[in-house]
Amino acid sequence: YLVGKNSKERMSWDIAKQAIDYILDNEQSFQEKSVVWDFIGGEPFLEIELIEKICNYIKIELFKRNHHWFDSYRFSFSTNGLNYHEEKVQSFIKKNIDHLSIGITIDGTELKHDLNRIYKNTGNGSYKDVVRNIPLWLEQFPGDGTKVTISSPDLPYIKESVLHLYNLGIHEVNINCVFEDVWQEGDDSLFEEQLIQLADSIIDNGLYEKNDCSFFSEHLGKPLACKLQNQNWCGAGMMLAVDAAGN
């Protein structure tokens, strides 16, 4: 999704329908009170017509089957925000607004964002095309946060990027470090320096009253409860995932 290294695959309507039918046909195996239909793996709104067809089918089938998930479901999306303003996307949002969760990924300042999030055909950064859609997104989903990714080259921009996102009106900033081996000697010291400077700015300006940053979660550095130590994360072993081929 971020670095565009994977092969392109497109889920067909038939595969999507088979997956939905399997889940709804086996209601006894899925007794959770509610369900989140999460569209992941690429930029979802490139396939807005297929997604709308899928979501319409889900809603109709839940109603026809008198399924216990009827009116207890959510459609979840993580988008790069480039085509958030487009008519078909906005039409879908307005139809489903009460059952939607949408997060736009913006990495911070224009400099930091455009280090990684560029157009493949031109090499130009995408920041300006994303940031123009932030006010509309915040108007429609005021409580949703963004997801930031950091790696070695953009470590110097952590502080200014988080503060920039706060200034845009994004109050929840979740940050993940790249897990791959991209780090350089001395990155740990630079990382620490940026976090200290960011923390000082947040405290000195009282930004903690309305804003959150996952780097400063009160749970970090403390022992985990036994239940948390023995559970999987990111839905592993608990969430059912279906790929483009139906596997």
Regions found by a protein language model. Name each.
Residues 1-14:
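Canonical Radical SAM [4Fe-4S] cluster-binding loop centered on the CxxxCxxC motif
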Residues 1-3, 138, 207, 243:
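Extended hydrophobic/Leu-rich segments
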Residues 6, 111-117, 183-185:
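A short acidic, helix-capping loop that chelates divalent metal ions and anchors anionic groups
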Residues 13-40, 47-178:
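Radical SAM/AdoMet-radical enzyme domain recognition
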Residues 177-180, 247:
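Short acidic (Asp/Glu) and glycine-rich catalytic loops that position anionic groups and cofactors
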Residues 184-247:
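A C-terminal junction/extension of Radical SAM enzymes
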